[in-house]
Curated annotation (Swiss-Prot):
It holds the Pfam family UPF0259. It comes from Escherichia coli (strain SMS-3-5 / SECEC). This is UPF0259 membrane protein YciC. The keyword Phosphoprotein does not apply. GO terms for cellular component: plasma membrane. The chain crosses the membrane at residues 20-40, 87-107, 118-140, 152-172, 187-209, 225-245.
Amino acid sequence: MSITAQSVYRDTGNFFRNQFMTILLVSLLCAFITVVLGHVFSPSDAQLAQLNDGVPVSGSSGLFDLVQNMSPEQQQILLQASAASTFSGLIGNAILAGGVILIIQLVSAGQRVSALRAIGASAPILPKLFILIFLTTLLVQIGIMLVVVPGIIMAILLALAPVMLVQDKMGIFASMRSSMRLTWANMRLVAPAVLSWLLAKTLLLLFASSFAALTPEIGAVLANTLSNLISAVLLIYLFRLYMLIRQ
C-alpha cells in the first residue's frame, strides 16, 4: 500500500482534534511536573545571583571562556542549574511520550481514556523511555555542537524509537537501531514532520520570553504546555506512520 504524507497528516489532525482535551491535560500536567522539578532542584535565587558577581561577560569571547572566568563555586552553581533544567525536561518529555502513545493505544483499542489513566498506564515503560530520550538528546546535542546538520539528521533518524519501544516492547538500543533503518527507508515521510517540529520548537523558544510577562512560573508552564502540544502532534504522526509502514 502506498503511503502519502497527506493522508497521515489528515489522520493525525483528526485524532488530535478528537482527543484534544485529553492531550491538553497530559501536556499541561507534564509541563507542571517539569517546572516544579526544575524549581526544586535548581539553585536558590541568591545562588543564581552569584553567577553575575565578578564575571567579565563583555570580555569573554564565548561560553567556554565565560565558564573559565567563573570561580569554582560559580561553576558548581551553573552545573547544578543546567543539570536541574536537563533532568526536569527529560522527566517531562518521558512522561509526555509515554502518556501520548498510551492514549493512542487505548483509543485504538476502543477503551475510554483519561490523562491520568494514560500516564498511569505508561508508568512501567517510563524508565526505559527516560534513558532512550536521554541518549537521543545527547546524540542530537553532540551533532548540533559539531556542525548542526549531523544533529538534525540524528533527530530525524531516531524519531521513531519511542514509538517502537512502547508499541513493540523493544529494548532501548534495539529501538534506536530499528528506528534508524526504518526512517532511512522512509525519509521522505519522516523528515518533513521532524523538521517542522524543530522549526515550531525554535519559533516557540524565540517568543518564550513574552510568556514571562505574567509571572515566571505561569509563563514557564504555558510555554512548556505549548511545547508539549507540538511534540504530541509529532508523536501522533509518527505512531500513525509506523503502523501504516508495518502493514
